[in-house]
Amino acid sequence: MTTLRTAAQLCEHGFVAPERQKIIETVTGRYAVAVPEALAGLIDRNDPHDPIARQFIPDAKELVHRPEDLADPIGDDVHSPVDGIVHRYPDRVLLKLTHVCAVYCRFCFRREMVGPKKPIQLSPAKLADAIKYIRTQPQIWEVILTGGDPLILSPRRLRSVMKSLAAIDHVKVIRIHTRMPVADPKRITADLVRAIKVKRKPTYVAVHINHPRELTQQARAACARMADTGIPLLSQTVLLAGINDMPEVMEDLMRALVECRIKPYYLHHGDLAPGTGHLRTDIGRGQDLMRRLRGRASGLCQPIYVLDIPGGHGKSPIGPNYLTQREANNAAIIEDFKGVQHRYPARQR
């Protein structure tokens, strides 16, 4: 099976009913579709609510746009001084090397900006301008490679970018955001791992994983190839209705990540991307999940539940608040993971 990209191919392989092909063609004409073999093989065609299918198989509900939906929900454009750069926070920038992915998630917050009709990679001139911008901004401590998926690029291309960034003295950390270990595990070759690991500058890889079934033996092996060379691995997970918003699924996912040497980093509240409302939950649901996870799983398994404030105002943590109140004398009332309240005395002066 090759990567599935059209409604006809999805019908042929049993992921879309023939009577729905026409409406799905409308969706695929609006938003990019790519379902690689590694993920298509995980889908249970007999389960109409399969969590893998909900992430990657297009749905007519994507044509429903809500008043709150935004083409650029996290405000990338507001903070883009040059093509390819998003400079939202003082000490770090995003470097968007490509607008192409191995798989297109149905909830993607950059769905208006990515796809096969977009440039595969920044042109040499635009990349040079982006590197120049980083070089001339001494407050930039970390560069985050994103896109699209930067690991869709060749090891040669990645090696060149990493070398250029590593040569900038004030850049101390390089981070890569990717779906590739689960979307196409065989692409994580020894050559690619060597390309992204540079001397004297730590490289972190944040792997996007939303459901424990994505951590196949092949995906685990791909992650191990990076971890075995000393590359620290983090995870990014999006809270998604009907996919991972069940306590047992979230717990299983976080435990599986830690077992794979991947530290859970962010649990993202769904962004206001067009046509994704059916996959978003409310904030209270996410807080309940985090509260339950706190009581049942190791601290290693705890991600930070965050929301990207629309308009480009950055991430804010929105997890449950265990400090429920303060008394008149400044003593605190703290709630434990069971919901029981306890008094913590004020500091005596």
Predicted regions and their residues:
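Conserved, mostly hydrophobic/aromatic
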Residues: 39, 105, 265
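Conserved catalytic-core segments centered on acid/base and nucleophilic motifs
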Residues: 95-96, 108, 143-145, 150-151
